[in-house]
């Protein structure tokens, strides 16, 4: 085949492809302009054996209550963006895609979030994902996940929906702005302090010279010296008082700033404890034995603000005092060894509490 013929065939092929694309685009525009939606299909793409947070029936109800028209509506008149926003505003929905197929079917694909745990603590009723995203437990939902109860206070309000890290960062930013605002309140005080220091320096330089050209006598000169001393003493007292007042106000503002920084540290610590709580839930869920054995996790906030955990096992009638969420794997290993070497021979109903909070020992109480 000659080079000329080959180029000609390639050109014709590309022309045909371009023509098909133009024709297809025109056909799609015609369908969108004249076609109507004849069918609505809703798919929750990641429903699992644990249950579901969102169902097709729920989505149909949302769309109906919002007044968004679907069936019988012209394809190009369907508010796809509105549908996606309507569904996505529910915190338990991760992603939503809505589109109309060539055949006139409105497809809605929904990906729900995968909660790790449900919080039922201190007025809280929310699901939390492994990466720390919080959302309210929806009505008519059915999903089995571990439940944490108790008096524990999470580092976010009960009505919060969203990333806990983002909430903490927002709070930290607000505190940073408050600290900066307090720092700006110091600026006029610093200027007053510098002015007062200059006055004190000027006061030290104040001297009296004998006025020889006026034939000033010793008595007159001594009188002027005494007057200057009295004036300097009065000014010195005034400047020292001002310096004390200014310094006291600066230290007061600095104290407020330090209090705000303590709030920041407390926020960061509470966030760390919260993520550790998720970690212990993951540890239980990832182990076949502990997933079956631990039936309840009770969390509480101590007077010092620390987080402590208590486990309710399936075996026996005792509670496991787990304590702070440090050395989690070591504590579980210690408890498992005690199960095997202690309780299996002593009996599962002998103790009321098993305390594993302390290093290298298990303390039991009847």
Model features per residue range: what roles?
Residues 50-58:
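Short, composition-biased local secondary-structure segments
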């Amino acid at each position: 085949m000659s080079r000329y013929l080959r180029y000609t065939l390639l050109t014709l092929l590309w022309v045909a492809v371009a023509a098909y694309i133009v024709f297809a685009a025109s056909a799609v525009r015609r369908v969108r302009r004249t076609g109507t939606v004849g069918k609505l299909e809703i798919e929750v793409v990641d429903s699992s054996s644990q249950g579901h947070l969102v169902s097709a029936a729920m989505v149909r109800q949302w769309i109906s209550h919002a007044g968004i028209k679907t069936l019988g509506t012209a394809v190009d008149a369907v508010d796809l963006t509105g549908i996606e926003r309507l569904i996505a505003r529910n915190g338990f929905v991760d992603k939503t895609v809505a589109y109309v197929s060539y055949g006139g079917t409105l497809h809605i694909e929904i990906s729900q979030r995968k909660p790790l745990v449900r919080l039922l603590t201190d007025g809280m009723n929310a699901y939390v994902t492994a990466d720390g995203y919080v959302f309210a437990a929806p009505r008519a939902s059915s999903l089995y996940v571990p439940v944490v109860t108790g008096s524990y206070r999470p580092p976010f309000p009960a009505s919060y929906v969203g990333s806990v890290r983002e909430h903490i960062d927002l709070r930290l930013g607000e505190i940073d702005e408050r600290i900066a605002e307090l720092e700006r309140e110091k600026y006029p005080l610093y200027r007053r302090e510098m002015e007062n220091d200059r006055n004190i320096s000027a006061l030290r330089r104040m001297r009296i010279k004998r006025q020889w050209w006026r034939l000033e006598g010793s008595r007159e000169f001594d009188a002027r010296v005494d007057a200057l001393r009295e004036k300097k003493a009065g000014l010195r007292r005034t400047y020292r008082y001002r310096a004390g007042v200014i310094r006291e106000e600066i230290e007061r503002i600095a104290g407020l700033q330090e209090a705000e920084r303590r709030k920041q540290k407390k926020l960061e610590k509470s966030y760390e404890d919260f993520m550790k709580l998720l970690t212990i839930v993951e540890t239980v869920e990832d182990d076949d034995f502990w997933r079956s054995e631990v039936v309840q996790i009770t969390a509480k906030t101590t007077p010092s603000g620390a987080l402590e955990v208590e486990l309710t096992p399936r075996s026996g009638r005792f509670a496991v005092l787990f304590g702070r969420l440090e050395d989690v794997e070591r504590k579980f290993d210690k408890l498992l060894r005690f199960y095997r070497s202690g309780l299996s021979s002593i009996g599962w109903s002998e103790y009321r509490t098993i305390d594993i909070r302390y290093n290298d020992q298990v303390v039991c109480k009847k």
